[in-house]
């Protein structure tokens, strides 16, 4: 039986079913079939692949559009079988379809396009960026990725609820918000949720107020002063329960976020990338956990420029003729970029040399965000070198201070 160097598999990922095409490096398509996103569908997929591997020999390479999305857990199962996994760059795939259009458009045609991309990469080096091999990542970084994304979703939910609750409070009970500088304060939320009826808060005695968690004599005095002039709108009877429900949900979210951060702290201590990021002044636990989770492994980046583009700290040349300009890249991890922007802003306030560079960029007419990204471009070089060498950040004295 003839042997080949590789069995190539292309998967067009859908919501409930995926379209699969299996072929050889010669371009021959061996089989096409649909795969249900169920355990029995996964078993059928691997049975088909293993049958062709026994027949033709060689390794198995699997390419899928939508890695780490709707394809989960199929992508994890592919890697657990020892197959090489490639992520199809969907933007470059769209450009490929424009250059080599098909007669029609359906899932099976898209799956065959994946096999064509394999062949194109063999003969055209510039096309290798279309198929990006997925590097193995440490388990702790995979866990950090899921936990930090979960935390971010809860933080955003808390922000939405706070905005809604404050607007409802301002309408239903004018003046109540003035007793606190932040509606997210624990004592204020405990005060709101003490009773099922919002209007009863105006009649609570001082002894009852002091029994509420977080309220001492200072806050009790503020509440007592508000009670003397408390006023409720006509719709407080049905808006009040909504406010109390939102306040209780915010308390639940606070506890859930705190628990996630504690879990992240334990994983950061095990992650080499997170430890390195955490050693940079200004990059705290949350920033280090988010960046480590989104990067996964530094092995996926060929150089520091690739890392900078991925984290949104670098622009692409967009010059033509005498025009000199740049544009923002589209392949940016927005979560990693957000964590970098927060960490860099805190970093420059703690490191005088970074602050001087930031002020230099502002003096050149750059906006705050542009100056932060310019500083982040330099930090990406430092981070890439740190992670490659397994070193932590070293804060050294400036030359003029040593002299």
Feature-to-residue mapping (PLM):
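A detector of single, family-specific signature residues
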Residues: 1-403
């Amino acid at each position: 039986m003839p042997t080949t160097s590789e069995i190539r598999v292309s998967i067009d990922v859908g919501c409930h079913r995926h379209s699969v095409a299996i072929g050889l490096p010669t371009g021959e398509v061996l089989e096409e079939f649909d795969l249900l996103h169920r355990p029995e569908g996964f078993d059928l997929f691997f049975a088909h692949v293993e049958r062709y591997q026994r027949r033709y020999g060689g390794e198995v390479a699997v390419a899928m559009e939508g890695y780490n999305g709707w394809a989960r857990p199929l992508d994890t199962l592919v890697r657990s079988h020892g197959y090489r996994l490639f992520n199809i760059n969907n933007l470059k795939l769209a450009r490929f379809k424009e250059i080599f259009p098909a007669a029609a458009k359906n899932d099976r045609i898209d799956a065959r396009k994946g096999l064509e991309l394999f062949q194109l990469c063999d003969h055209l080096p510039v096309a290798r960026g279309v198929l990006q091999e997925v590097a193995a990542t440490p388990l702790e970084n995979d866990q950090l990725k899921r936990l930090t994304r979960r935390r971010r979703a809860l933080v955003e939910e808390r922000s939405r609820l706070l905005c809604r609750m404050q607007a409802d409070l301002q309408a239903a009970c004018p003046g109540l918000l003035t007793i606190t500088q932040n509606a997210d304060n624990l004592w204020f939320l405990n005060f709101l949720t003490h009773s099922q009826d919002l209007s009863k808060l105006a009649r609570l005695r001082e002894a009852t107020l002091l029994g509420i968690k977080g309220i001492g004599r200072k806050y009790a005095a503020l509440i007592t002063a508000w009670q003397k002039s408390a006023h409720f709108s006509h719709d407080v009877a049905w808006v009040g329960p909504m406010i109390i429900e939102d306040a209780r949900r915010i308390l639940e979210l606070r506890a859930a976020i705190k628990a996630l951060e504690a879990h992240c702290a334990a994983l950061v201590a095990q992650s080499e990338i997170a430890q390195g990021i955490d050693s940079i002044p200004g990059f705290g636990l949350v920033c280090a956990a988010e960046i480590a989770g989104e990067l996964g492994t530094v092995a996926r980046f060929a150089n520091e420029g690739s890392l900078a583009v991925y984290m949104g700290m670098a622009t692409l040349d967009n010059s033509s003729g005498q025009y000199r300009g740049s544009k923002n890249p589209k392949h940016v991890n927005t979560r990693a970029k957000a964590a970098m922007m927060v960490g860099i802003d805190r970093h420059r306030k703690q490191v005088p040399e970074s602050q001087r560079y930031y002020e230099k960029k502002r003096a050149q007419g750059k906006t705050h965000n542009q100056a932060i990204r310019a500083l982040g471009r330099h930090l990406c070089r430092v981070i890439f070198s740190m992670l490659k060498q397994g070193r932590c950040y070293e804060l050294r004295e400036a030359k003029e201070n040593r002299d």
